[in-house]
């Protein structure tokens, strides 16, 4: 079955071979979808016939957002920590263990309901591809439970057993557990492995050991680094074949050179800095150096509890030195690059049919009018979603 989506006032394709700029913008456009894939893109007047039609009434249409960094499987509410930070308390990474305790106690059905609620929020915000991390179990049983829940919702599941050291373990003992029994147990459910390399979590040697174990298990590599301070691990980790380094607030020139030389994506997470009152990363410095940049939510219960890419777009252009064009690209095609995907974050023949129409004449309004619900319709894999108001419950 095919459908032609026509009368698109302004279409962003992220395909520079069409349109007039890097965003591949086309005015008065149409898109033909066959099944879950895009079959044709071009001017409305030239659109081929299809079985069905959908009239966008002149709306602006963009690719679905690609959120390449999120932590949506957990239990428990940490709003009190946000309140403490807003009252002057300094952010440290210790709150993760509060979520671990609640998550270990939660049944799988409850965790699935939490993730479903967050994904519904994301869909209402225009997100159609989500990377989801484990990391709130820190024992074999719970990490497997989190991986199973996440894998029932997305193909982009990341094993983050190396979030912090489990409270019942010594650091070296826990690294052995992560690299051995835990990794083996979660392997059927995950595509990626990630490590939180920061003071209070894992040091560079431990980080490299865990990443190498992930490589041996056939997983793609991701890294949290340079969020709380400079990191020594990034150049060495990039040589292992990282897909992305995430946070990237405190990067050295050597770090940026390594990202560029290895084609590693720098994923920026402005909602984390917004919530923790930490300095924002300098996105312009990365773009000027030719590094590929992604923009994601870091949706998590402690330091960035937002599911909204549009919110992150607004922060990125105001606080991080991104142009609006760079921000939109980073939240779509950039996120796809961070996941080594070429079938999402773009509107072109062969790509998955993920489209978002806006209740605005231009995508610029996503940043120009922050906080306004401008997402009108969302098409994911060729199906228009029903955007019900999600009901998120964090405590059983």
Swiss-Prot record:
Supply one GO CC term from the record. Answer: cytoplasm
Keywords, in A-Z order: Cytoplasm, Histidine metabolism, Hydrolase, Iron, Metal-binding, Zinc
Residues noted as binding 4-imidazolone-5-propanoate in the record, renumbered to the chain: 78, 136, 163, 227, 303
State where Zn(2+) binds.
Answer: 69, 71, 224, 298
Pfam families tied to this protein: Amidohydro_1
Q: Where does Fe(3+) bind?
A: 69, 71, 224, 298
Cite the SUPFAM superfamilies for this sequence: Composite domain of metallo-dependent hydrolases (SSF51338), Metallo-dependent hydrolases (SSF51556)
Q: Which cofactor does it need?
A: Zn(2+); Fe(3+)
Q: Where does N-formimidoyl-L-glutamate bind?
A: 136, 300, 302
User: E.C. number, please?
Assistant: 3.5.2.7
Query: A single GO BP annotation from the record?
Result: L-histidine catabolic process to glutamate and formamide
Instruction: Describe which pathway this protein belongs to, using the record's wording.
Output: Amino-acid degradation; L-histidine degradation into L-glutamate; N-formimidoyl-L-glutamate from L-histidine: step 3/3
Report the HAMAP family cross-referenced here. HutI (MF_00372)
Protein's name according to its UniProt entry: Imidazolonepropionase
Q: What species is given as this protein's source?
A: Cutibacterium acnes (strain DSM 16379 / KPA171202) (Propionibacterium acnes)
Q: Which gene encodes it?
A: hutI
């Amino acid at each position: 079955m095919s459908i032609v989506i026509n009368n698109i006032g302004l279409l962003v394709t992220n395909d520079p071979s069409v349109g007039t700029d890097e965003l591949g913008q086309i005015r008065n456009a149409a898109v033909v979808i066959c099944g879950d894939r895009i079959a044709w893109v071009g001017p409305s007047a030239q659109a081929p016939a299809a079985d069905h039609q959908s009239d966008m009434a002149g709306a602006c249409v963009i690719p679905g957002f690609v959120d390449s960094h999120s932590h949506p499987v957990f239990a428990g509410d940490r709003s009190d920590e946000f309140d403490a930070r807003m009252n002057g308390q300094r952010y440290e990474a210790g709150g993760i263990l509060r979520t671990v305790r609640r998550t270990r106690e939660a049944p799988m059905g409850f965790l699935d309901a939490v993730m479903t609620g967050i994904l519904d929020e994301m869909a209402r915000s225009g997100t159609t591809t989500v990377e989801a991390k484990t990391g709130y179990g820190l024992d074999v049983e719970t990490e497997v439970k989190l991986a199973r829940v996440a894998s029932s919702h997305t193909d982009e599941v990341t094993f983050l057993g190396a979030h912090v050291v489990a409270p019942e373990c010594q650091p070296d003992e826990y690294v052995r557990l992560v690299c051995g029994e835990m990794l083996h147990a979660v392997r059927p459910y995950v595509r990626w492995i990630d490590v939180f390399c920061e003071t209070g979590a894992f040091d560079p040697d431990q980080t490299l050991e865990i990443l190498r174990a992930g490589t041996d298990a056939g997983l793609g590599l991701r890294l949290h680094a340079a969020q709380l301070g400079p990191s020594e691990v990034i150049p060495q980790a990039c040589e292992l074949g990282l897909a992305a380094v995430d946070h990237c607030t405190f990067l050295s020139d050597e770090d940026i050179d390594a990202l560029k030389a290895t084609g590693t994506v720098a994923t920026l997470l402005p909602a984390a800095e917004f919530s923790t009152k930490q300095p924002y990363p300098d996105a312009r410095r990365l773009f000027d150096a030719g590094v590929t940049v992604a923009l994601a939510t870091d949706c998590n219960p402690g330091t960035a509890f937002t599911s909204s890419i549009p919110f992150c777009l607004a922060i990125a252009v105001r606080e991080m030195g991104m142009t609006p064009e760079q921000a939109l690209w980073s939240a779509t095609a950039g996120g796809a690059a961070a996941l080594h995907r070429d079938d999402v974050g773009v509107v072109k023949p062969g790509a998955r049919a993920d489209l978002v129409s806006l209740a605005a004449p231009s995508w610029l309004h996503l940043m120009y009018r922050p906080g306004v619900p401008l997402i009108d319709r969302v098409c994911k894999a060729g199906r228009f979603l029903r955007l019900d108001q999600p009901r998120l419950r964090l405590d059983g």
